[in-house]
């Protein structure tokens, strides 16, 4: 579960290494790109949710710099995810992929496995870039 002030690893090559959640959005990808549903008042973010975050640590010559405010989609959480078939999956660390306003990743690569729930949330570009979908 990701909440404001939570720190996440960045699982892409956009230049950011670590981000801190500022706000959790009620959101997903709609027919015309990214829809936030008015922001909402959601307390926690899970896999597939979009957050607003501040870049805390970045590579020297990356596309994003430390201090930038970005949108990101959560791809891994250390809190267990319960699935419809009764199984659960849990990752070692929390991680996110930085996205633009259309819901597409800003980087060209995704590192590490991502959860299958991203496919249900229509983040197909992230799923296709990931080396493994669990």
From Swiss-Prot:
Keyword annotations of the record = Ribonucleoprotein, Ribosomal protein, RNA-binding, rRNA-binding
Asked if Protein biosynthesis is a keyword of the record, the answer is: no
Q: SUPFAM superfamilies given for it?
A: Ribosomal protein L14
PROSITE patterns, sorted: RIBOSOMAL_L14
Q: Which branch of life, at top level?
A: Bacteria
Q: Which GO terms describe its molecular function?
A: large ribosomal subunit rRNA binding; structural constituent of ribosome
Subunit structure and binding partners: In the 70S ribosome, L14 and L19 interact and together make contacts with the 16S rRNA in bridges B5 and B8. Part of the 50S ribosomal subunit. Forms a cluster with proteins L3 and L19.
Q: Which family does it belong to?
A: Belongs to the universal ribosomal protein uL14 family.
This protein is called what? Large ribosomal subunit protein uL14
Origin species: Deinococcus radiodurans (strain ATCC 13939 / DSM 20539 / JCM 16871 / CCUG 27074 / LMG 4051 / NBRC 15346 / NCIMB 9279 / VKM B-1422 / R1)
């Amino acid at each position: 579960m990701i909440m404001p002030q939570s720190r996440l690893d960045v699982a892409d090559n956009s230049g950011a290494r670590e981000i801190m959640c500022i706000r959790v959005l009620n959101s997903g990808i709609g027919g015309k790109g990214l829809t936030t549903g008015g922001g909402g008042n959601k307390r926690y973010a899970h896999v597939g949710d979009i957050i607003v975050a501040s870049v805390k640590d970045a590579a020297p010559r990356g596309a994003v710099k430390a201090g930038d405010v970005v949108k990101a989609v959560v791809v891994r959480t250390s809190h267990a995810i319960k699935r419809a078939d009764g199984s659960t999956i849990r990752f070692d660390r929390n991680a996110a992929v930085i996205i633009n306003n259309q819901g597409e990743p800003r980087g060209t690569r995704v590192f590490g496995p991502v959860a299958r729930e991203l496919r249900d949330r229509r983040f197909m570009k992230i799923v296709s870039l990931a080396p493994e979908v669990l």
